[in-house]
Amino acid sequence: MTALPFPVAEEPDAFTAETGRKLFAGPSEFVKGVVAMSGLPPADRVEVCFAGRSNVGKSSLINALTGTKGLARASNTPGRTQEINFFTQGPELYLVDLPGYGYANAPLKVVEKWQKLLKQYLSGRQTLRRAFVLIDARHGVKAVDDEIMKLLDTSAVTFQCVLTKADKVKAAERDKVLAQVRAALAKHPAAYPEIVLTSSEKGDGIATLRSIIAHLE
């Protein structure tokens, strides 16, 4: 039987899950919001970033990972908060929340400024180990998602697709979305060959994602 491209990541074994649990058992704190490269905190630890359309559930996922309700705050207005937000997870990890994209109502100058900052950050941050691109399991990959994936390709940043709100779709519909996502990912050389299914509300996939992050060096 031929293996599917971009399989869904399996749940970690007990040892691997414990490594992830220990990492995220430490304190989580907001460090700063950055609007220019000069404001970046010291590149002194492993870093992962989270990208996704507005309302994809990015803040909820970060809060679920850290177990800290309200750590990352959502904005319902695309383009409203044009900052790269840094959070510490213990002494060894930065979680980086990139601004939600989807700019139908955002001024062009705001979009251009954010795109410039994002390109500089992705191409110039040596401690960035992986980007997680969040895709709503109800909708699949949209054109704006494909654009961020292209940017990650050109920046040579490995990215992994995380399907959010997986509990909101039935199995048959989820399989259709997975097929569409796999086809989209196949076009991107920087795509990591595994997909993570998550539900921040129910906690599904959180241990898996914690373990993945814990094993990045």
UniProtKB/Swiss-Prot annotation:
Residues 44-217 form the EngB-type G domain. GO terms for biological process: division septum assembly. GTP binds at residues 52-59, 79-83, 97-100, 164-167, 198-200. GO terms for molecular function: GTP binding; metal ion binding. PROSITE patterns: G_ENGB. Its cofactor is Mg(2+). This is Probable GTP-binding protein EngB. It comes from Ruegeria pomeroyi (strain ATCC 700808 / DSM 15171 / DSS-3) (Silicibacter pomeroyi). The gene is engB.
